Amino acid sequence: VGQNGPQAGTPAHMRALNQRLVLDRLRTHGEATRPRIAADTGLSKPTVGQALLDLEQHGLVRATGRSLAGPGRAAVVYQAAPDAGHVVGVDIGRRVIRVAVADLEGSIVARLDEPNRCRSASALVRTVSDAVDRAVASAGLAPHEVVATVVGTPGVPDPATGTVHRAPNLPGWERRGVLHELVSALAVAGSDVVVENDANLCAVGEHALGAALGVDVLVCLTVGTGIGMGLLVAGRLFRGAHGAAGEIADLPYGPMPSGAGARRPGPMETAAAGQAVVDAARALGLTARSAKDVFRLARAGDERAVRVVEEEAEKLAYVVSAVTAVLDPRLIVLGGGIGGNADLLAGPMRRALAATIPAVPDIVAGQLGEDAVLAGAIATALDTARDLVFDRRGLPHTAGA
């Protein structure tokens, strides 16, 4: 029950608790009859009946119009109303901005991919806001029907200063106050807006829907234009004291640079991200325009490309060994444009790790591909939205409230 709910211990508070218990049962396990809900929750049938009546009046549950076969009187089947609210997920990538709109069951009702050609932070804010508006409209929704929005971005969002730190691949995105501008642009109709690191959302997405289902201690290592890491401990996202957990671009590797630009983009990112793979291939005489070209050549058996891939795997093993020494994860999920080549990387990574750490975690490819961050954004937004639609039940909507 929300902070503005009824006082604890009062009849109104008990009714709210019963309503939430019934609603959570329907969301978690699917549609059911009143007797089934009573058996599952331990509440009496009259209590369940009153809770269902209250929730139905608020638009949070509905009768499906179907009955279960069986002896005696047919029972009405109830379900949580998936359209009681909607959420938006956004993935801001260097080349593509992805937007999805989902109902409270997580079903995608609209999807939009927009090329990112922005050369300034202000242009990027406008482009993201416009893409969200178009996606919401294409779903046939009014802006106020969006309850929560979660945006994934490279770097470390700092809500206190409105700054995104460590995002050198997005022009102007580290400008002070840009986070406030983005949130303001997306919250015009009262939607709760959160901006989260993209690698963190990748981990959440794979945990919710992908390769890490049921795994409570895991690392999602994303490698592409940049390099990042999302950490889940006890099934929950671990951000660290300052929100910078997993910023492995800064991990020391090789000779440490000095001077004003020493931290841009970071020694590990310089050594292992996409451009490093291309540079290593060209140094061996290969013609490669992208890391994708290098992995394609390696699959075709080119010995020089195979050598580059094995060197990349050793660098990634170095990253994994560092985090494994502290976190001891059960699973490493590889994501991003380079990480998606786990079929070539996982073997040499395991061999390198076996020589340095006592327990080598499983290493697998992410299952969600380029949609992993978007899936994590939707999953995170749903957690917020489901609470908000319950806390706001019976209240008239006011834009900006």
Predicted features and spans:
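Proline-centered loop/turn at the N-terminus of a beta-strand
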Residues: V147-A148, D192-N197, D362
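Short glycine-aspartate micro-motif
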Residues: V87-D91, V146-V150, L218-T222, G228-G230
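ATP-binding/phosphotransfer module of carbohydrate and carboxylate kinases, centering on a glycine-rich
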Residues: V1-R66, G70-E145, L209, P255-A401
